[in-house]
Amino acid sequence: MRCPYCGHEDSQVKDSRPTEDGAAIRRRRQCEDCGARFTTFERIQLREVVVIKAGGTREPFDREKLMRSVQIACRKRPIDGARIERLVSGIQRQLETSGENEVQASQIGAMVMEALKGFDNVAYIRFASVYRDFTEARDFEEFASTITEAARPIK
């Protein structure tokens, strides 16, 4: 494994253990050249998934890109990083086990929306504002009112 600090090719694994959800292996490594320590995560990749963007371009599924977009939606919210990790891992697992080699970007967005719906209303609205391309304050108001309506008890 290449050292992120000096670029040296070899590192030594000092500690290895499964993550909380068991979906990855966390490895503590030390560079053999500069001695820097860093952490890597090893995950099983069941299938290579290609994402079809709105413009028709195709690109490999990028877990880190999905993670960043969810983290941005959850920024400054009382949400534990481990919960975000589980949410992203769950979506990735669904994609890899779906049997499809290609998936529309809009389908991934819908999966994130569905996961965030029961997660945190503010994060849900933030993600929706990008996913649904809100352009005016009225778009936020209309979307927020659907959440409020859904949350009201039936009389």
UniProtKB/Swiss-Prot annotation:
What cofactor requirement does the entry state?
A: Zn(2+)
InterPro entries named in the record: ATP-cone_dom, NrdR-like_N, RNR_NrdR-like
Q: What is the free-text note on the cofactor?
A: Binds 1 zinc ion.
Q: Name the Gene Ontology biological process terms.
A: negative regulation of DNA-templated transcription
List, for all copies, the residue spans of the domain called ATP-cone.
49-139
| Segments for region (Disordered) | 1-24
Q: Where is the composition biased (Basic and acidic residues)?
A: 7-24
Protein's job? Negatively regulates transcription of bacterial ribonucleotide reductase nrd genes and operons by binding to NrdR-boxes.
Q: What is this protein called?
A: Transcriptional repressor NrdR
